[in-house]
Amino acid sequence: MATPPYAELHCLSNYSFLRGASHPEELVARAWALGYQGLAITDECSLAGAVRAHTGLAELRRDLRAAADAPEASAQDRLLAERAEQFRLVFGAEFRLACGLKLVLLAKNRAGYGNLSALITLARQRSEKGSYRLVRADLDAISPAGAVPDCYALWLPDAASSAEDAHWFARRFGERGWLAVELHSGADDAAWLGRTAELAAAAGLPRLAAGDVHMHLRGRRPLQDTLTAIRLGTTVFEAGTALHPNGERHLRHPLRLARLYPAELLEAAARLALACDFQLDTLRYEYPQEIVPAGETPASYLRRETQAGLARRYPQGVPPAIADNVEQELALIIELGYEPFFLTVYDIVCFARDEGILCQGRGSAANSIVCYALGITEVDPARASLLFGRFISRERDEPPDIDVDFEHDRRETVIQYIYGKYGRDRAALAATVIRYRTRGALRDAGRALGFGQPQIDALARSLAWWDKRDQLPARLIELGLDPASPRVAKWLDLTGMLIGFPRHLSQHVGGFVISRGPLGRLVPIENAAMPERSVIQWDKEDLEALGLLKVDVLALGMLSVIRRSLELVGRRRGAPFALPHIPPKDAATFDMLCAADSVGVFQVESRAQMAMLPRLRPRQFYDLVVQVAIVRPGPIQGDMVHPYLTNRADPAASARTLARLPADVRAVLERTLGVPIFQEQVMKLAEVAAGFTPGEADQLRRAMASWRQKGHIERFKQKLRDGMKARGHDSDFADALCRQIEGFGEYGFPESHAASFALLAYASAWLKRHEPEAFLCGLLNSQPMGFYAPAQLLQDARRHGVEVRPVDVTASAWDATLEDLPADPDAGRRPAVRLGLREISGFPEAAALRVAEARAAAPFADTNDLARRAALQRRELDLLAAAGALQALAGHRRQAAWQVAGVCLQGDLFDAAPPPEAAVALAAPQEAEELLADYAATGFSLGRHPLALLRARLARGRFLQAAALARTPDRALVRVAGIVTGRQRPGTAQGVIFVTLEDETGSANVVVYAGLAERQRRELLGARLLGVFGQLQREGEVVHLLAKRLVDLSPWVGGLAARSRDFH
C-alpha cells in the first residue's frame, strides 16, 4: 500500500509548557522520518518553540545535504536530502476562546505571521504572566481586513459544539476555515466522523485530518501524563479524565492514519500545509531611526559622533593607525547596515552618563575602536591588540553583540528610559527558558506520582546542586528507598526525562529587542512577572538564530561599588574624583595583588584567583588581563596555565618556546609568551596558520562554544589541519593547536572581555589599597554581590586597619558612611566607617530615612522621642534594640529592650495610660550573648571573633589558627577549624570542592576531593563551624589544606547565625 500524503497541522511541543512532551526538534525530525509532507508547530497562544523547530529543520537539511554531496553518496542519500528540502514547516498557534471555542491559526505568509503574532500579543498582554484571554471580537481587532487575515483557521469542535458554532466560524473565516477531525482510536471514532460531517455540511466547511499531537513517540505518554498532573497540581492517579485515555496523541505513521481517516481528509491536510509558504528566515528586522537628528543619515551621524569621540579620546591627535582602523570599521558597519544599532546603544549610554549612572561595555564590543570612541567601551583596542573580526565580519550571519554593564541598583532607570523612548509596543526584553534541573524535576515528578512530601523533601535535601541523575539511586538507598521498586524506578525515569525540559519563560537578564515598527508583529510579547516589564517569547539563542538585534542592558554590582566609593573619595578629598583620576601604574596596588590580598576586588577575589595571583604576580595592566582570563575552564582544560606560568617565571624558557614557533604564529602568541590564552588568539591563529578568513575564524569561535553539544568543531578541525599542512606546518603542531581549541570549549574567555573586566579589577584594587574606608562603604552599600558576605568584608577591612563603628540610631544613615573626615586629605589620620541601618536584617529603608530626617531636625532625647518623631512601629523599635543600635539612647541590649517595651506608640491600646514605672537596672549581657545577638541581628559582630572565644577549647583539640599555616612546613599533618564562609566547586575541578574557613586571625583554604566530599557530604554541606584534619600543601606563597577528614563542630557555636556564600 502506498504511503498516503499527510501533514500534521495541530501539534504541541514542550513549549506549550507542561502539556507537550517532546522538543520541537524531535517533532520535526520524527515527522520527516515518517514521510510527512509537513508539520505545523501550534503551541497554545505561543510561538516560543517556533525557532527551535526552524533550526531543527535547518540542521536536518544541512546534515542530509552534506551526506548527499559526499563523494560516496548514493541515490538514496540524494533523495533524502531532496525530500528534506521539500518538507514544509508551518507556524501556527492553538487558542481556547473565552466562550470555550477551540481554534488553530496557521500563518499563510509573512502578513499572516504578523497578524498571528499580534493576536498572541493581544491575548497575552491583557493577562498576567503565564495566561491569556481571547474573545471572539478579538479576531477582528487585529486588522480591518477581517478575522486574522492571511491565516488559515482550523476549528476543533468537541461534543458540546453546535451548528451555531459552525456557522459563526464559517462566517468569520470563509474559504480560509476548515473543520479539523481528530481521531485517537477510540470506541466513538465512527460516530465522531459522522458528527463532524454533519457540522461541516451545515456550515459549508471543508474537513481535514489532524492529530492533537502532544509527543513525537508513544513512549512519551508517561511523561505527558506526569506533565498534566504537575500542571493541575494533582497526581496521575487522581487526574482522571484530564489525562488522555490512550497514547495515540503522538506522530503516527501515515499508513496507520489511513486506517482511521478517509483519504480525502489526509490529502486535505497535506494540501493546506503546502499552501503555507512562510518561513522564519524571511523575517527582516528594521532598526529604530529616531536617534538620528533631522538632516542626518544614520551613517553621517555615526561618523560625526565617532570623530568627535576620537578627538576626546586622543586630545594630542589621533594616531594614523587608529584613524585607518576607524575608517575600515565604519566602512564595514555602513556596508552591513548596522549604523542604527550602534547609535541605539550610544543613545542609551549617553542617557546613563547624563544621569550619573556608571556604565561600561564589555565582551566582543571592546574590540571596536568605534565603540571606544563613542564611549560605549573603555578599553583602547589599539593598546590591547584586540581583533575587530571577533566583533563584526562580513561572513557573520548575525548582528554584532554589544553588552553594556550598568550599576546594578540603577539599571531599572535605564530600562524604563528604553521603554519610555520607544514604547512598549516596540521594546521588550528577551526571554529566558527556565528548564528543569535535578531537584525541581525530582520534586515535581515525585508529587505527580503520589510520593509523600517528607520523602520528597528528604531526597531533595540530600542532593547537592552538582549531583546528577546517576547519583540518585545512592541517595534513595540512604533514605531507605529501593531503587529497584517499580514505583521508585518510575520516579527516577521521569525525573531523568524532565531534566532539561522547559518549564516556563522568564525574562533575560537584560537583553532588549527594539524595533522600528510594532515589535508584536515580529515576535509575540507578553507580560513579565515584574511590574512595568514586558518580554518577547524568544530567548537569546532564538534571536541569534534569526539574526535579530539584541541590546544587552546588564547589571554589574562592582560598578555600583566603584561609583559609590569614588563619590566618598571625592567628599574626603574635597574635589570630584572619577575613574580617570586613578593612577594607572600604581606599584602599591600591584604589590597588594601579588600578595593575594584581594578580598572584595572585582574578578580576582575567588579562592582560585587568590591562589593564582602570587604565581602570576601581575605588575602591569596587561598582566591583569591575563589574570582575569587564565583562571577559567578554557585555559585550564586546554593545558595552557602551567606552560604560561613556566614561561613567565623563566624568560629563557619563554624565549625557547617562541623561537620554536613559525614567525606568523609567534606574532600572535608573543604577548602571552607562546601560549594561547584568549579566544581572539585562537581565531587569529586560524587565520595566519590555516588560511581562515576573519568570518570563518568567527564561525570557528561559535563552533567552539557549542562543540560539546553539537560536535560542529570536527569540520573545522579538518580544515585547520589541511590549512596548516598547506602552509608548511607539521602535523604535531596542528594536532596541538586542535587540542588547545577543544580545551577552550564553551569556556574560552575573549581578550576584549578580560580587558574590560581588568579595568574594573584594577580600579577596585586601587580603591582597596589607597581608599579602604570608602571602598568598604561601597561594598557594604551595594550588597548583595560578590563572593563575600558583609561579615568577611568587615573582618578583612579591620585587619587592614579600618576603624568600623557600629550601627547607631543617633549617627547611622541607611548606608554606611565616613566619619571624622580630616580637613587635610593628605593628613595621616584616616576616616572611620559608620555602619548603616541597612545592616539590620529586616529593618526597612523607609524607616531609616525617617530616622535620618528626624535626627537632622534635632538630636533624639530618648527612645520615646525617637519613636515619636521618626514614626517607628513596634517591630522596628524591637529590631533596633536587638541590633544594639539604641546603645546611645538606652544602653545595652537588655536595657534597650526594656525601654522599647515601655514606649507608648500612637494608636497603642494604652497610649493614654500613665507613665510606666521607673526603669530597672538590668545586667549587661555576657560577651557570648552579645556575639550571638550581633550575628542574629546583622550577620556579623564588631566584637571578638567567635573563634577567639573558643580558642582555649580549640587549642586543647590541637587546632591551629589560620595565620599559623603560613609558618607550617609543607606536607605537615595539621588540624584547622573555622566558620565556613564559602564553598566553591569549579566546573573544571573534577568534583573537588574548595572551602574557606575563617577564624580570628584570617582564612584557611581547604581542598576537599570528590571521594571525601561524597563520604562526608553532611559535614561538608551542613557545618557552620567545620574542623578539618588534613595535610598542608605549599606552592610558593600559596597554602592549601588537603582535607583527610571533616568534623562538624557547629554545636560549639550554638545558635550562631553565620552565613556562608556557597557555590557562587
Curated annotation (Swiss-Prot):
Entry function: DNA polymerase involved in damage-induced mutagenesis and translesion synthesis (TLS). It is not the major replicative DNA polymerase.
Entry similarity comment: Belongs to the DNA polymerase type-C family. DnaE2 subfamily.
Domain of life: Bacteria
Keywords: Cytoplasm, DNA damage, DNA repair, DNA replication, DNA-directed DNA polymerase, Nucleotidyltransferase, Transferase
HAMAP family on file: DNApol_error_prone
UniProt-recorded name of the protein: Error-prone DNA polymerase
Broad class of the protein's primary localization: cytoplasm
Organism in which the protein naturally occurs: Azoarcus sp. (strain BH72)
UniProt-listed Enzyme Commission number(s): 2.7.7.7
BP GO annotations: DNA repair; DNA replication
Gene Ontology CC entries for this record: cytoplasm
Catalysed reactions listed for this entry: DNA(n) + a 2'-deoxyribonucleoside 5'-triphosphate = DNA(n+1) + diphosphate
Coiled-coil stretches: none
Listed CDD domains: DnaE_OBF, PHP_PolIIIA_DnaE2
Nucleotide-binding among keywords: no
